[in-house]
Every structure is written in C-alpha cells, then in structure tokens.
Amino acid sequence: MELNNNMKDITGDPKKAVKKLAYPIIISMLLIMSNNLIDSIWVAGLGPEPLAAIGFVTPLFLILAGIGTGIGAGVNSLISRYVGSKNQTKANEAAVQSVVLGIIVSIIVTVIFVVILEPTLYIMGAKEVFNYAIDYGRPLFIFSMVTILPVAYAGIFRAEGDIKRATLPMCISAILNMILDPIFIYTLNLGITGAAIATLISIFIELLIILYWMFIKKDTYFKYTFKNFKINWGMYKEILNVGIPAGLEELLMAVVAIAVNLIFEIVGGTSAVATYTIVMRLISIAIMPTIGIATSTITVVGIAYGARNFKNIKIATRYSLKLGLIFSIVTSLIFIVFSNQIAFLFSYSANSSSVAPTISYILNFVWLFIIPVAFGATASYAFQGMGKGITSFLLTMQREAILVIIFTFILGISLSLGVRGVYYGLVIGNAIGSAVGLLCIEIFISRLLKKANS
C-alpha cells in the first residue's frame, strides 16, 4: 500500500508531524468545549437547579465519551505502530477490526448505563435535582452508541494522518449544537431535555458524516471491506491494552468529578456544585490546546516506537510539552485579565447571578491548575503511543484521583477551609501529580536511548 501525502507527513519530521496533527485537533476540541460551555450558559438561564443537574450527569457522560476515546486511542496506537514498522496490511486490518469493536462495546455500554442511571444519580447526591438530572441524562444514555462511535472512529483517521476527517465532523457537530440549543431549550420549551436532544442530533450528524466517508464515498486511506471478515482477538487485545486504560482514565476523571461534587455539596450545597460545573468547563476549554497537542503525540510517538526510532520519541515529547506550555500560559492570562467579563456570561439572569462573584475569584488563580497539565498530559499520551496503557493509567490515577481527592478532602473538610479549600486542593493535587508524570516519561525515554546506544 503506497503512502499518501498524509502518511508521508506523519512519518517524517516529528515536530512537523506534531504540528500537523495538533492544530486541527485543538480547533475541534475548543469548538466542542465552547459548545459545552454555551450549553451551560443556555441552561443557566433555567436556574441553578438545572445547571447543577448537568453537573451531576456530566461525569457519567464523560465516561461514555471516554470509552470512545479509549477505543480511538487504542486503535491510533496500534495502527501507528504498524505504520512505523511498515506493515500496511496489518494497519488496514486493525482499522477494519476497530469498526466492529466500537459497535460491540457501544451495545454493551448502552445496556449497562440505562440500568444504572437512576441509582447512580442517587449515590452521587443528586436528590435535590433528581428529576432534572433524569430528564437530561436518560436520552443521552439510551443513545450511547451515537456518542461513542464518532470519537472511536476519529482515532482511525488520526492514525492515517487524515486530520481533516478526524476533526471536521466534530466541528460541524459542535456548531450545529450551538444553533439547536436555544431552539430546543426555549423555542420548543423543552427545557433541560431539549439540551440533551440537541446534543444527540448534532452528534448523530457527526457519525453519519464519518460513515459516509468510510462506506459510501470510500476514498479513505484504509479500505473498509468485510468480505471474509473474522474477529481478530489478538488485535482486540492490543487495542484494548491501550483502550481500556485510556477509557479508565476518563472513568477516573468522572469518579473524581463525582467525589469532588460530593465534597462541594457538603461544604457549599447546590450553588457550590453549580459553580464548580461552570469553572471546570472553563478550565476544560483552557487546557484543550494542551490536550490536543498531547493527543497528537499518540500517533507520532507510536510511529517512532514502531520504527524503533527512540530519538524521535524524545523530540516529539519535548516539542509537545513546549507547545503545551505556551498555550497554557496564554489561556491563563486570558482568564486572569477577563475574569469579571467571563463570570458575567453566567449571571445574565436573576436565577444565576449568585454564582458570578465566586467564578470571578476562582479564575484569578486557576492558572496554577492549567499550566501543570502540560506536563502530566504529555507524559500520559506519550506512554499510550508506545502501547504502555497501564503506565499511562497509573500516572493519571495518581494525578487526577488519589492526590486531588486527598487534598480537596483535607483542605475543604478536614481543615474547614470550605469551598476555597476544595479549589486549593484541586490545584495542589494536580501540580504534584503532573510533576511525577514528567519525571516518569523523562526516565523512560532516557532508558530507551541508553538501551539503543548500547
């Protein structure tokens, strides 16, 4: 199979490959997170209770997206390693196998989430806003496949260097959702349920575009034919060796969000949860460039690892970290300078005006959270690219779960610092964990280079 221009780009200079893959990913991720933020702005007009309900459902929804992301990361890593070792036949087979794997996983996950939704919301402490949470969550989880498949299949396009197809459907989906939100929430008077329906319609369009390219237009680098198809359990194992830990990372973040929600509920009630929901969505937008750059390292590092070119692994990782830090500093400055204006976006109605002062205060020090993410994310995604899914997961677990929960509990509850103490805990836990991640990837790459030289 002859390499096309996309493949030539991602198998060449690692710095150019990172930039080629990263910038479109950043744009698409920013659009998606902006869409989520706008979703919150529209729902904020309904009052703090619906907004808090989204805060309770969001961690569960992130699990769905995380499952798709996990499969996509596993496929991306496996295909990239095959490409690096110049085994194009196996790379194509892995792409086809991933299409079927995504469908199988989606069906299983849908059944599980429909069953556990109500009891899980009770356990999370959503009793005060339970009906709102069900109205928003039930449609999303009944149609889980719509959420999982586009994210999973985007990993295939990233692995073949076709970043346009990996990101364009997501951008279209995000823009469409921004248009549909006010129509379904207010014009059709569907309230919080309308927000869920708008999300599903926009993501379904995204999925249709991807399937059109794969099975109707048929002009992708990899060819999707199921003639003589047999499930390759060895490939499924390879995909899931990275995919399960990567998906568990998203699950871990959801669990942390649930735990932090409970801590906020204890120290500040529903209004604190509503504020945290907004703040985390703002932070998510701020770190998206860093995450986009780190995501590109899965492909570039995977190709270098498959080719046993360990020097390129170091170059790609260091360059990704440098770009991530630059973007983190810029977004942090924007938050500091425009904190009052950003907070005002969430206080345009009498129902939601109470959360604005707290948001404005928090935005002035969240740079302490945003900047360290570059270290932790780059390390985790580089390990995924090399097929070290467990290592990536363990680094994420200590950074985003163990340390964050410990410090938020100690500062927020044990030391009675309240809501501000919880935010301090988020910052400290993330900073320490990110430093550990950076240390681990530096040691690992140094050992690879030493082994190669010897």
Regions found by a protein language model. Name each.
Residues 51-111, 147-166, 275-339, 373-395:
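Small-residue-rich hydrophobic transmembrane alpha-helices
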Residues 72, 139-158, 166-177, 195-210, ...:
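Short runs within selected transmembrane alpha-helices of multi-pass transporters and secretion channels
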Residues 31, 35, 64-68, 108, ...:
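Residue-level hotspots within pore-lining transmembrane alpha-helices
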Residues 30, 34-52, 121-127, 183-190, ...:
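Helix-terminus/linker motif at the lipid-water interface of multi-pass membrane proteins
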Residues 43-62, 128-132, 192, 235-242, ...:
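Interfacial/gating helices of multi-pass transporter permease domains
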